[in-house]
Design a protein with these regions (language model features):
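Conserved Radical SAM active-site core
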Residues: 3-16, 30, 41, 45-142
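Short aromatic/hydrophobic contact patches that present stacked aromatics
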Residues: 33, 90-92, 172-174
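Short, glycine/acidic-enriched capping/hinge loops at junctions between secondary-structure elements
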Residues: 24-27, 44-47, 247
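Conserved AdoMet/S-adenosylmethionine-binding subsite of the radical SAM
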Residues: 99-249
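S-adenosyl-L-methionine
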Residues: 13-14, 21-31, 37
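A generic secondary-structure signal marking the coil-to-beta-strand transition
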Residues: 7-8, 30-32, 202, 230
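Short, flexible, solvent-exposed loop/turn segments with mixed acidic/basic and small polar residues
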Residues: 23, 52, 163-165
Length: 249
């Protein structure tokens, strides 16, 4: 029996909120974002007017929001988020790097399922450096949006076993593109690689590197043309286009 009064998670400053998925394969779908704090990477290259330190999820840096499962459930009830999930909104678990807390997350989702008598649709946003527990797919039918960091963003040591796993389960691979050289790197490391990743084009999404609506307008067409040339998917940053820099929308 899971003690929901004692088990905890660390959440970012924006906690949980309802919105539309803004990026990748599930773009436009109703989603309840659960943003966890803490990350195992330091992204140095994603610099824009809105993220000068290089991270596009800087709200996940705080580790002060330690909440019990009961506190999270109450917050979700107060915000109407449980009802959203019951009608098939996606539970988008993001960060930071959510797999850092996956032991607790497995308990949390199991407790949520028992308490409210349904299992939510789950999609993770992950950097692809930590192996997910097999239970996520086998028991919960979770999907994954993988966003590997390129040289532009600090290029952490590759984890081919993790990336091969995601390629095999047909995860969405989303790459932030800032220049043409990024595409050569993607093809060398992930498509025509010698480590067995060998991504298929239809599982790849190119997304512009930007932090505001104005920046998006400037660079999106170029990245879209790259996607056309390489026969891969293009993902805008829908939240920037609709709401610019606003949070919790």
């Amino acid at each position: 029996m899971i003690d929901t009064a004692k088990e905890t998670l660390f959440l970012s400053d924006d906690l949980l909120f309802y919105t539309l998925e803004g990026e990748g394969e599930l773009i436009g779908q109703p989603s309840v974002f659960m943003r966890l704090s803490m990350c195992n990477l330091t992204c140095i290259g994603f610099k824009s007017e809105d993220s000068p330190n290089g991270c596009d999820s800087y709200v996940s840096w705080s580790v002060k929001n330690k909440m019990t499962f009961d506190e999270i459930f109450q917050y979700m009830e107060d915000k109407g988020l449980i009802n959203r999930l019951k009608v098939e909104a996606v539970l988008k678990i993001t960060g930071g790097e959510p797999i850092l807390q996956q032991k607790q997350l497995l308990k949390f989702v199991e407790a949520l399922s028992e308490k409210y008598d349904f299992r939510p649709r789950i999609d993770f946003e992950t950097n692809g450096t930590l192996m997910p527990d097999l239970k996520w797919v086998d028991d919960f039918g979770a999907t994954f949006t993988v966003s590997p960091k390129l040289t532009t963003n600090g290029d952490p040591e590759s984890k081919p076993d993790v990336l091969c796993y995601h390629a095999n389960i047909q995860s969405c691979f989303k790459f932030v593109i800032s220049k043409a050289e990024d595409i050569d790197e993607i093809w060398r490391k992930y498509v025509e690689d010698d480590k067995g990743i060998n991504l298929e084009n239809y599982r790849i999404w190119f997304m512009p590197c930007c932090g505001s609506r104005e920046e998006h307008i400037k660079v999106a067409v170029t990245v879209a043309e790259y996607a056309k040339q390489m026969n891969v998917n293009f993902s805008p940053r829908l939240h920037l286009l609709l709401w610019d820099k606003a949070l919790l929308v």
